[in-house]
Amino acid sequence: MMERFEKIEMKIPAKAEYVAIIRLTMAGVANRMGFAYDDIEDMKIAISEACTNIVQHAYKEDVGEITIVFGLYEDRLEIMVADNGVSFDFNNLKRKVGPYDINKPVEHLPENGLGLYLINTLMDDIQIMHDEGMTVLMTKYIQREQVENDGNPISTYNSY
């Protein structure tokens, strides 16, 4: 049986001035689903980085589109960010930029690739697919807070 979910799909021009619209939409969706404030802030950074990577690298001189799909599941939010621009080898880039040595000063960190490192750090799961363009699938699970009533855990989650 297929897992039940709701889907929200958006398309924006691959321009920096539209990234805030996606970030605000995602924050509203995540808030409605019951995500904690810190998790919403993490997802805002991750989706901004994914969209900014497309704006800076995917289309070069041409102006293309960014497709964003939110998959709202009971226990998680899946965010797909896709373009039809120039793609790159994520695994090769990942080897070049991470992991980082915490003893090195910030000045010695590489300038490129930090966005993908941030996304990988802030989200629970990330998948990169590249055929015609690049697709980034990010997943964040809802952390249910629990309180106890007479020794029995009670979820503070209210379903939407």
Curated annotation (Swiss-Prot):
Gene3D superfamilies tied to this protein: Histidine kinase-like ATPase, C-terminal domain
Domain of life the protein comes from: Bacteria
Stored Pfam families: HATPase_c_2 (PF13581)
Keyword Cytoplasm attributed: no
Keywords: ATP-binding, Kinase, Nucleotide-binding, Serine/threonine-protein kinase, Transferase
Catalysed transformations (reactions): L-seryl-[protein] + ATP = O-phospho-L-seryl-[protein] + ADP + H(+); L-threonyl-[protein] + ATP = O-phospho-L-threonyl-[protein] + ADP + H(+)
NCBIfam families per the UniProt record, alphabetical: PRK04069.1, rsbW_low_gc
Family: Belongs to the anti-sigma-factor family.
Protein name stated in the entry: Serine-protein kinase RsbW
Species this chain originates from: Bacillus cereus (strain ATCC 10987 / NRS 248)
